[in-house]
C-alpha cells in the first residue's frame, strides 16, 4: 500500500479529506500500472480539478503515479484557501521532483483545450436546491466550503458541466477519473454519456461510506 500524504489544513476553509478522497487515492493506486504503461515514456500533464487540501495531487507526486520526473501537475480550485492548502501539503510531504502549478479557476476555464492527459475530479456531489454562488470575499470561509460540497439538482450540476466539456479537456489518449455518489444516479449518467459521446467508461471501484455509496469511473475515448 502506498503512503498517504500528511495533511494539515484549516478545515473551516478547505474540504477535509474523507472517504471520497481516500477512495480516489485507492483507485489511483489500483490504476498505477495502467498509467505507468500509458504515460511512462513521455511527459504528461496531470490535472486535479477541485484540489481542496491537496491530498490527491500530493499523493500523485509523492508516489510517482505518473512516473516521468518532469510531468506537470495542475491543481485547480475556485477556492483560494484550497490553493494555499495544496501548496502547503505538497511542501509538507517534500514533493520537490515534480512541477506543480495551482490555478484559481472554475473547472477548466483556464486550461488549454486537449492538453490534459490525466484528469481527476472529486466534485461537489451533495444534492441541493442550487449550486452556491462564489463568495464575494476571501474571508467568507463557510461559503467557500459549501462550494466543495453542494452540487445542485441530484448533486450533478457541476459534474454534468464538466462531462459536457470532457472532449475539449482531455488529450487524444487522455483518461479522466471522476467520483460519483449513489444519489447522482451514476448508471443513468454513464449511459447518457456513452450514448452521446461513444466513449469508454469503466467502473474502477465502489465503496460504501457510512450511509453513502461512492464510485469512481474512468473515461477514455
Swiss-Prot record:
Alphabetical list of Gene3D superfamilies matching this protein: Vaccinia Virus protein VP39
Domain of life: Eukaryota
Keyword ATP-binding: no
GO biological process, one term: regulation of translation
Positions with a binding annotation for S-adenosyl-L-methionine: 50-54, 77, 122
Binding site for substrate: 122-125
Catalytic activity as recorded in UniProt: L-glutaminyl-[peptide chain release factor] + S-adenosyl-L-methionine = N(5)-methyl-L-glutaminyl-[peptide chain release factor] + S-adenosyl-L-homocysteine + H(+)
Gene Ontology cellular-component annotations: cytoplasm; eRF1 methyltransferase complex; large ribosomal subunit; nucleus; ribosome
Keyword set, alphabetical order: Cytoplasm, Methyltransferase, Nucleus, S-adenosyl-L-methionine, Transferase
Keyword DNA-binding: no
Main enzyme class: transferase
Function summary: Methylates eRF1 on 'Gln-182' using S-adenosyl L-methionine as methyl donor. eRF1 needs to be complexed to eRF3 in its GTP-bound form to be efficiently methylated.
Subunit composition and interactions: Heterodimer of MTQ2-TRM112. MTQ2 is the catalytic subunit carrying the catalytic and the S-adenosyl L-methionine binding sites.
Family, per entry: Belongs to the eukaryotic/archaeal PrmC-related family.
Protein name: eRF1 methyltransferase catalytic subunit MTQ2
Gene transcribed to yield this protein: MTQ2
Amino acid at each position: 500500500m502506498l503512503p498517504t500524504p500528511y495533511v494539515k489544513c484549516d478545515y473551516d476553509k478547505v474540504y477535509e479529506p474523507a472517504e471520497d478522497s481516500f477512495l480516489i487515492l485507492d483507485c489511483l493506486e489500483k490504476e498505477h500500472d495502467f498509467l505507468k504503461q500509458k504515460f511512462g515514456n513521455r511527459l504528461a500533464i496531470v490535472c486535479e480539478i477541485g484540489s481542496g487540501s491537496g491530498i490527491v495531487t500530493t499523493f500523485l507526486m509523492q508516489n510517482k503515479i505518473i512516473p516521468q520526473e518532469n510531468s506537470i501537475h495542475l491543481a485547480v480550485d475556485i477556492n483560494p484557501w484550497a490553493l494555499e492548502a495544496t501548496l502547503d501539503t505538497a511542501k509538507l510531504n517534500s514533493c520537490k521532483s515534480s512541477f506543480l502549478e495551482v490555478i484559481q479557476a472554475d473547472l477548466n476555464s483556464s486550461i488549454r483545450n486537449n492538453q490534459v492527459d490525466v484528469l481527476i475530479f472529486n466534485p461537489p456531489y451533495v444534492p441541493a436546491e442550487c449550486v452556491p454562488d462564489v463568495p464575494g470575499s476571501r474571508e467568507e470561509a463557510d461559503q467557500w466550503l459549501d462550494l466543495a460540497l453542494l452540487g445542485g439538482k441530484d448533486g450533478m450540476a457541476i459534474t454534468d458541466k464538466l462531462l459536457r466539456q470532457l472532449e475539449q479537456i482531455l488529450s487524444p489518449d487522455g483518461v479522466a477519473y471522476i467520483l460519483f455518489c449513489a444519489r447522482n444516479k451514476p448508471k443513468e449518467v454513464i449511459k447518457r454519456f456513452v450514448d452521446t459521446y461513444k466513449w469508454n467508461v469503466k467502473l474502477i471501484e465502489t465503496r460504501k461510506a457510512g450511509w453513502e455509496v461512492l464510485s469512481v469511473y474512468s473515461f477514455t475515448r
